[in-house]
From Swiss-Prot:
Biological source species: Artichoke mottled crinkle virus (AMCV)
A GO CC term attached to the entry: virion component
Family: Belongs to the tombusvirus protein p19 family.
Protein keywords: Host-virus interaction, Inhibition of host innate immune response by virus, RNA-binding, Suppressor of RNA silencing, Viral immunoevasion
Gene Ontology terms, MF aspect: RNA binding
Protein name from the UniProt record: RNA silencing suppressor p19
Organism domain of life: Viruses
Assembly with partners or alone: Homodimer.
Compositional bias of kind Basic and acidic residues: 1-20
Gene3D superfamilies: RNA silencing suppressor P19 (3.30.390.180)
GO biological process: symbiont-mediated suppression of host innate immune response
Length: 172
């Protein structure tokens, strides 16, 4: 029988674990490790004059179960391969497994949060709605990452709306 971990004990255990299984041979069910950029990478890719600008190398996400919060940074370069990799980094089953270690018999709050390029999405509810939170989190993560703007110069970005040439030819 596993004991319910509360307060400081829970935080200490969470700090000792990473989403990839962490120290001491524990397994949390999450497949990818934290991929936070080094201080040098962070300085190169951030505008120091704008402290609100996110690092363009990836995104931050977290799962919270009561007072225990698992955070990580994943690299994401907006390619199809990268999208499939980060979307497959956890499933509802792996979240349920990780949560079951901290939820115990009492209903506590569960929260998923993701921040990418200045947009932050947070989904929360009670532990009895965890499966629904997982489904919403997967959908939100996929939509947020797929809707990332592609930096391509177009007629619109140069001040000329698309079809301007066609309109000019027809009027002549």
């Amino acid at each position: 029988m596993e004991r319910v971990i509360q307060g400081n004990d829970a935080r200490e255990q969470a700090n000792g674990e990473r989403w990839d299984g962490g120290s001491g041979g524990t397994t949390s069910g999450f497949k990818l490790p934290d991929e936070s950029p080094s201080w040098t990478e962070w300085r190169i890719h951030n505008d120091e004059t704008d402290s609100n600008k996110d690092n363009p190398l990836g995104f931050k996400e977290s799962w919270g179960f009561g007072k225990v919060v698992f955070k990580r940074y994943l690299r994401y370069d907006r390619t199809e391969t990268s999208l499939h990799r980060v979307l497959g980094s956890w499933t509802g089953d792996s979240v349920n497994y990780a949560a079951s270690r901290f939820l115990g018999v009492n209903q506590i709050g569960c929260t998923y949060s993701i921040r990418f390029r200045g947009v932050s999405v947070t989904i929360s509810g009670g532990s009895r709605t965890l499966q629904h939170i997982c489904e919403m989190a997967i959908r939100s993560k996929q939509e947020l990452l797929q809707l990332a703007p592609v930096e391509v110069e177009s007629n619109v970005s140069r001040g000329r709306p698309e079809g301007a040439e066609a309109f000019k030819e027809e009027s002549e």
